[in-house]
């Protein structure tokens, strides 16, 4: 029977027993939110006792319980794979990340999270599940294209985007998925094209495995758009390495290293490792890239116990002096790249601590929630980078103010405190719904940015009063949500759920932090 909906979802309540524990949501009923399009659960909140199941079997038993709601025929283990299990030592909770599969093929971006409290009870499910794929006969057929032909199709198309064949950083590869786009499911190859010439790009292509048509494409490259001395003349201290009589911008004390290179105004990466004879560095762009990468590493390590962007100490590599008068900084999937700016729109972009932290947070997001860089999930991707940029550079709530329009005092790229001051929405009712900027990823980030600001600082917005909880607790909530709850296609509603669940995990179901999260998202119109 088809369910009826209000707004984007319907909440179904099923009576269950009440848990007396405050470490998990105090649900008197099971709450299920259904996805508007697929009519399957996108959120389940409850306290469910597994009755003797242990380890992964808890997850499988839980999914078995809801197989009818997911419209699953047969074994649930044929429809999901457990791709990650993480234990939070602070809360003694477990967090499982799942991947939906069909005939052994992963459905691109369709991941789910299942969460287990300290007593072994399942407390929530969050994510998207697409049902009834058996009805699409094309998904059962063998691909007519092989991986090599799919790559060729993508390269041919991107040549039209950039004007010539790019010089790829690494050889492009194709991976087979089931890809859902505009209400249709396709057997498709995902092809990532990463290049620097003739212009930097990190394009994601989805090629129909039968026809060779381009189903969807978008550029994932994030644009900022808009002792030694740094770009602003400030003196910084940072770790280097000495080899013989030469000093190198190479820090071996953090993870597997932090290294800073120069492209010498060319476009080859990583370029040349920065060196000096007396360990007093005068290249401001290099000093800032190195020192700011160290500070960002220290923040995530000391505050969130994360060892580099991948959690395993990966080398943080930065290149400055990229190209000539280049007004951009970006994470290309393996390293940071900074232009020198043109002196009018931008100073050297590594001079902004919040810019460096913003870009490195993209690397963290890529290794955790994997938020797809389009539409609402892309706006959340951008917002997470803004939020942690403001947490690392914590003297204000502006982004890029140190390096943007140096001739104009008080200017910035964005504001978390007042997104509207820079043309960005501060309420869901004002969101951008067009196709520019990958569906408004830099614009609509203002909605979640405003919620984060209100959560930290408090205030009244659209008639809703929020009692702030401070930057520290706010950062803990968003980091927990990013690493444990959000999935590739999470939207704003899922962000609210993830933040509430994270605040519950960290501070308790009846805490002022949970109340503040709910108020903050009420204030920006996210239900």
From Swiss-Prot:
- The protein's name in its UniProt record: Bacillolysin
Q: Does the keyword Protease apply?
A: yes
Keywords on this record? Calcium, Hydrolase, Metal-binding, Metalloprotease, Protease, Secreted, Signal, Zinc, Zymogen
Question: Which residues lie in the propeptide?
Answer: 29-223
Q: What is the protein's known function? A: Extracellular zinc metalloprotease.
Where are the catalytic residues?
A: 359, 442 (proton donor)
> Temperature behavior, per UniProt?
Thermolabile.
Provide the GO MF annotations for this entry.
metal ion binding; metalloendopeptidase activity
Please give the organism: Brevibacillus brevis (Bacillus brevis)
Task: Say which enzyme class the record assigns.
Answer: hydrolase
What gene is behind this protein? npr
- Subcellular location per the Swiss-Prot or TrEMBL entry: Secreted
